[in-house]
């Protein structure tokens, strides 16, 4: 159960899929994943329920939104950025480019990459603004 006084002060959204069901954003991998994960196999109603942008209001916490130049979900970030702007939610948006090679989906999890360190340091700096 969620504590009544819980207040999320900031969130990070990294290399994510934020909107489901857009025909132009649909791909076989995502469609198959939704069929497996959602009880009714990814009906339009279920897809609407998992759309992040459905839940963005002016009360949404500040966002660190990140993707990478070769992330297969890269087109999702600008869609969410548009919603954040419309709702006047404070956010930082970064699309990372590699210093030595092209960066792909969730590159920031590879701690051996200097580019991952750069991304994670920036994300930590973002959160420091919201720590007491």
Regions found by a protein language model. Give the residues of each.
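Alpha/beta-hydrolase superfamily serine-hydrolase fold, recognizing
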Residues: 1-132
């Amino acid at each position: 159960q969620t504590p009544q006084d819980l207040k999320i002060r900031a969130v990070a959204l990294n290399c994510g899929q934020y909107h489901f069901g857009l025909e132009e954003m649909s791909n076989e991998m995502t469609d198959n994943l939704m069929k497996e994960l959602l009880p009714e196999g990814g009906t339009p109603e279920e897809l609407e329920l998992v759309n992040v942008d459905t839940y963005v209001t002016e009360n949404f916490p500040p966002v660190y939104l990140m993707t990478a130049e070769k992330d297969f979900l890269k087109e999702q970030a600008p869609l969410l950025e548009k919603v954040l702007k419309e709702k006047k939610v404070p956010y930082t948006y970064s699309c990372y480019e590699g210093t030595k090679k092209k960066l792909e989906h969730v590159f920031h999890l590879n701690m051996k990459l200097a580019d991952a360190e750069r991304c994670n340091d920036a994300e930590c700096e973002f959160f420091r603004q919201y720590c007491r």
